[in-house]
Amino acid sequence: MAQDSNNLIWIDMEMTGLNPGTDRIIEVALVVTDAQLNTLAEAPVLVVHQPDDILNGMDKWNQSTHGKSGLIDKVKTSILSEAEVESRMLAFLELHVPAGTSPMCGNSICQDRRFLARSMPKLESYFHYRNLDVSTLKELAKRWKPEITQGFNKQGKHEALADIYDSIEELKYYRQHLFNI
């Protein structure tokens, strides 16, 4: 598939916590859609190795969530560094979307951008500076059309790839019910 500047790059990451100054990225997933939100390509989900001291520093919520999903075990056995994950994800994106054209798409995406800016700056700079943040629409729907907010339920698995598909489906829902498109 050739590069298309109208394609959208969706990203989700799992981290050891919410502070990009002290916490680390442990899982990255990318999906490319066309402008109508049809999936065009899915990158392999990559797990970043992090040392035990980083994993042991996670709070109870993260230890429980990432333990139940099996992600902690995957992190321990992964041989991929942050730099290797960044390089592989860039190689994937270069096949589908020209640099600097797609906003960063997802839910609460500025949190992902903060982590990328610190730990994977080349990947962060591949995106346009704008964000397509589905959580913005959720907040607007709560205020402008609260009756539709109960109509979409995310799976909430806290697994990067599943969370991307949740975000895409949520945006499709708002496109239909908030914008009537």
UniProtKB/Swiss-Prot annotation:
Pfam families, per database record: RNase_T (PF00929)
Gene: orn
Protein known as: Oligoribonuclease
Enzyme's top EC category: hydrolase
GO MF annotation, one: 3'-5'-RNA exonuclease activity
Keyword Nuclease set for record: yes
Presence of the UniProt keyword Cell division in the record: no
Family: Belongs to the oligoribonuclease family.
One cellular component term from this protein's GO annotations in UniProt: cytoplasm
Active site residues of this protein: 129
Protein task: 3'-to-5' exoribonuclease specific for small oligoribonucleotides.
Localization: Cytoplasm
InterPro entries membership: Exonuclease_RNaseT/DNA_pol3, Oligoribonuclease, RNaseH-like_sf, RNaseH_sf
EC number: 3.1.15.-
One BP annotation, GO: DNA metabolic process
Every Exonuclease domain range: 8-171
Entry superkingdom: Bacteria
CDD domains in UniProt: Orn
Record's keyword terms, sorted: Cytoplasm, Exonuclease, Hydrolase, Nuclease
